[in-house]
């Protein structure tokens, strides 16, 4: 299994417009972050996790001008714009009348259908993406024969989902994990987890909180994602982390 970090930034991305802090003015491209998303390849099948407003540019960075394969499915973690704002750009994957399957909880599916209703109408305008919504619950399901295990997370007071595929778990935007969900996170080779910044935040984990989760879950390796410009410079933060914890960056590919 291969995972590519398409984006590792928070809702505003890095750099922020109008900001002159050391991160936003950094010349290190690892400090430049699109909105958080990931592309997973399993046995030649592609699964996208979240589809934010930077999706088109992320695809250009990933595939350049090379042909790309079909998407087996898109897993949605929650309804916030930085995670679903690029769904219309899935139209490139819908040529030749191909359907892209979306997977989301009922309340998330409803929110998406309200925001882009033209995508789900029976008689679509020519050229709009051909998306099919699949409502899921907090129970395992399959995407093109690949087992997906949802993980209940709390984004402040908002219930959202993380996902486990094989021995990799992708947990973004969480503040807490319900105690009963930890059994789903045993035996991980790789944990991907949000670490917004050092300072306390009401709906996202801080760096220290993410490190505490890593200690509790005990993956072989862990990667931080969904980082703001106040997270700090990539290289400086990496030096302060345990040897099995890494600051992810856009374009990083890992193998599990």
Q: What are the residue ranges of the model-derived segments?
A:
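Binuclear metal-dependent hydrolase catalytic cores
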Residues: 1-171, 236-256
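Active-site-proximal loop/helix segments of hydrolase catalytic cores
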Residues: 154-161, 165-194
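Binuclear metal-ion centers of metallo-dependent hydrolases, dominated by the metallo-beta-lactamase
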Residues: 178-256
């Amino acid at each position: 299994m291969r995972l590519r970090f398409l984006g590792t930034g928070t809702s505003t991305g890095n750099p922020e417009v109008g900001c002159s802090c050391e991160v936003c003015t950094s010349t290190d491209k690892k400090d430049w972050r699109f909105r958080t998303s990931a592309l997973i390849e399993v046995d030649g099948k592609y699964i996208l996790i979240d589809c934010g407003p930077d999706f088109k540019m992320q695809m250009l960075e990933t595939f350049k001008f090379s042909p790309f394969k079909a998407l087996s499915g898109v897993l949605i973690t929650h309804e916030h714009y930085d995670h679903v704002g690029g769904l219309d750009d899935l139209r490139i994957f819908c040529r030749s009348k191909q359907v892209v399957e979306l997977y989301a909880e009922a309340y998330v599916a409803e929110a998406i259908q309200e925001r882009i209703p033209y995508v789900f109408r029976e008689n679509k305008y020519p050229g709009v993406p051909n998306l099919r919504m699949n409502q899921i619950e907090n129970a395992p399901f399959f995407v093109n024969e690949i087992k997906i295990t949802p993980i209940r997370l709390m984004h402040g007071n908002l219930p959202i989902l993380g996902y486990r595929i094989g021995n990799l778990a992708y947990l973004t935007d969480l503040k807490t994990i319900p105690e009963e969900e930890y059994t789903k996170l045993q035996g991980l080779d790789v944990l991907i987890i949000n670490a917004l910044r050092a300072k306390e935040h009401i709906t996202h984990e801080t760096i220290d909180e993410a490190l505490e989760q890593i200690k509790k879950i005990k993956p072989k390796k862990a990667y931080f994602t969904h980082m703001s410009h106040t997270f700090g410079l990539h290289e400086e933060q990496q030096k302060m982390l345990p040897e099995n914890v890494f600051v992810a960056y856009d374009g990083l590919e890992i193998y599990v």
